Amino acid sequence: MESIIDTEDTIAAIASAVSLGKGGIAVIRVSGEEAINSCKNIVETKSKYAWESHRVFHGFIKDNLENKFIDEILITVMHSPNSFTGEDIVELHCHGGVIVVNKVIETLLSNNTGVRIANPGEFSQRAFLNGKIDLTQAESINQLINAKNLKSAEIAFNGVKGEIKKKIDIIKNDLIEQLSEIEARVDFEEDFSEFNYNDFSRNIKIIKEKIKILIENSKRGAHIHNGISIALIGKTNVGKSSLLNLLSKKEKAIVTSIPGTTRDIIEVNLTIKDIPIKIIDTAGIRETDEYIENIGIDKSFEMIQNSDYIIYLYSLEEGLNKDDEKIISKIPQEKLITILGNKKDLIDSKKVNKKNLSNSVLMSIKNDEGEKELVEKIVKKCGSKEFENIDIFLNERQISNLTDCLKNLNDTDPIIANKLPFDLLSIEVRDGIKNLSRITGQELTEDLLNNIFSKFCIGK
């Protein structure tokens, strides 16, 4: 693709996570025409492999302006075009931690006039513009970096390998074949028999089914990326925060005996039996005059509507009362995983009234008792089978383009039904192809491109 954005500058950024005050190794990536020369200005080395492509060699960072050494490093060099960006790349592997890393970056910039800090996603943007990756691969890299569970990472990596582009190209080639026949008939109509609207309709229907399956799988795949949301709903001080901590195996929420402690929504992503789950701890529901707490309670009722599933908690010590039943009545039954009675350790479970509680679980969250039964109910309700055949999923932008393509193909229906001039079909098919090309990045505006890559991290 011809570059529509200036890529003449040499850019630099931290390409690894840096811990505040400590860290093992940090990587500073430099890419561009002056990448090698700019690094030569601040690196002293005696290695015989220095500055050869695809070599790692030892050296020291030196600030020539202050005439002092900064750090001992390893240097990796990749010459154009055999690099991620397609440009010359140098990666400086220095000791981690904010102080050292910032000083290396400062030294690189102050000792060279032609180097600047990279914009978010600019390395990936250059890789795309230089034809090293297509747009779906670039976006999949970002999904991989931001994956919240292993399944999401696996699917994102399929996109990095080019699997999204493969599926889009199959659909695109099918449409190009249909368009080619229409245009050939327009140019050489006398050489063809009468146009068969039924055959065309049949072929378009097959293509539309492929698109619908891809859209549906992508929507299901969003659950993998974000996690199936399960909201913990109940009155105050019934153990919602304790359950969140139990399932996540971490102290994510404050646990006290003071009612109304949780006022903000707390989310934890985890995997249960290979199912990506997002557990949401909500504010306890009760009558209160406190303004801030009421905001949290309002959010709890919102989560009843917005979450995929719900676990309702109540205290066995108090029993399931009319207030609980009133809240439960607001929960769509298809969303309800279970009604969980907590604090089993404080009562005689034989005396619990289980009327209308066939779907209940009795637990002592404090003593880790009943977790296995709860997990079984979560797995049964959420299931993992719906994810078995998902190998890729498209993001919102890609789904939007695919949906627009589907609309183009649906717009051929009245043309076919009324047997209007068949050359009108070419308009819709061509627009459909353009929408598919937008997915892989062949039909772009500069603003759209900048918007996509601005959502990436700076070092990528």
From Swiss-Prot:
CDD domains in the record: trmE, TrmE_N
GO terms classed as biological process: tRNA methylation; tRNA wobble uridine modification
Enzyme Commission no: 3.6.-.-
Cell location: Cytoplasm
Positions that bind K(+): N237, T256, I258, T261
Main location, first listed in the record: cytoplasm
Ranges of residues in domain TrmE-type G: 227-383
Binding site for Mg(2+): S241, T262
Family matches, as SUPFAM superfamilies: P-loop containing nucleoside triphosphate hydrolases
Keyword Hydrolase: yes
Keyword entries, A-Z: Cytoplasm, GTP-binding, Hydrolase, Magnesium, Metal-binding, Nucleotide-binding, Potassium, tRNA processing
Domain of life (superkingdom): Bacteria
Pfam family, one: MMR_HSR1
InterPro entries the record matches: G_TrmE (IPR031168), GTP-bd (IPR006073), GTP-bd_TrmE_N (IPR018948), GTPase_MnmE (IPR004520), MnmE_dom2 (IPR027368), MnmE_helical (IPR025867), P-loop_NTPase (IPR027417), Small_GTP-bd (IPR005225)
GO molecular function, one term: metal ion binding
UniProt subunit comment: Homodimer. Heterotetramer of two MnmE and two MnmG subunits.
Function: Exhibits a very high intrinsic GTPase hydrolysis rate. Involved in the addition of a carboxymethylaminomethyl (cmnm) group at the wobble position (U34) of certain tRNAs, forming tRNA-cmnm(5)s(2)U34.
Family according to the record: Belongs to the TRAFAC class TrmE-Era-EngA-EngB-Septin-like GTPase superfamily. TrmE GTPase family.
Protein name: tRNA modification GTPase MnmE
Lineage: Bacteria, Bacillati, Cyanobacteriota, Cyanophyceae, Synechococcales
